[in-house]
Design a protein with these regions (language model features):
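Catalytic cores and adjacent binding grooves of peptidoglycan-active enzymes
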Residues: 79-129
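Extended, low-complexity, intrinsically disordered C-terminal regulatory tails
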Residues: 34-78
């Protein structure tokens, strides 16, 4: 699976990160997160929305965030400790087109069962115990 088949880097990072690093921003993500979101997108067969700033929308901090982003900058200014998986490239907030949160959870469970069954089948086929 290739994440670039489903997402543009602008969708996954804040505008500050994109403006400074461009396509190099892909390297800031944990590969497991990219693989996970790619599998979810592929298995559900529906578009996923993270950030929309690049197309004039108001979603700006649902992917990789930086110290300049309002959410992080405000907490820093107030001397609040802020450690987030969004800063480390290991979390995304997103919507799935045409699905409610409950429908997504049900779909995610089906994906999980698919991979558990595939894992068990591979384990049995290879003779592992």
């Amino acid at each position: 699976m290739n994440i670039k088949n489903y997402f543009n880097i602008k969708e996954l990072v804040c505008k500050h990160v994109y403006n400074k690093f461009g396509e190099m921003a892909w390297t800031f993500f944990d590969p497991r997160l990219l693989e996970t979101i790619c599998v979810i997108r592929e298995k559900l067969g529906k578009p996923i929305t993270v950030n929309t700033w690049h197309s004039g929308g108001g979603l700006t901090q649902r992917g990789l965030r930086c110290n300049v982003c309002q959410l992080v900058a405000e907490k820093t200014r107030l001397e609040k400790v802020y450690v987030s998986a969004h800063l480390q490239g290991t979390a995304l907030d997103f919507d799935v087109k045409g699905m409610t949160a409950l429908e997504f959870v049900i779909g995610l469970r089906q994906i999980r069962y698919f991979f558990l069954i595939r894992y068990a089948w591979n384990k049995m086929s290879l003779g592992y115990t």
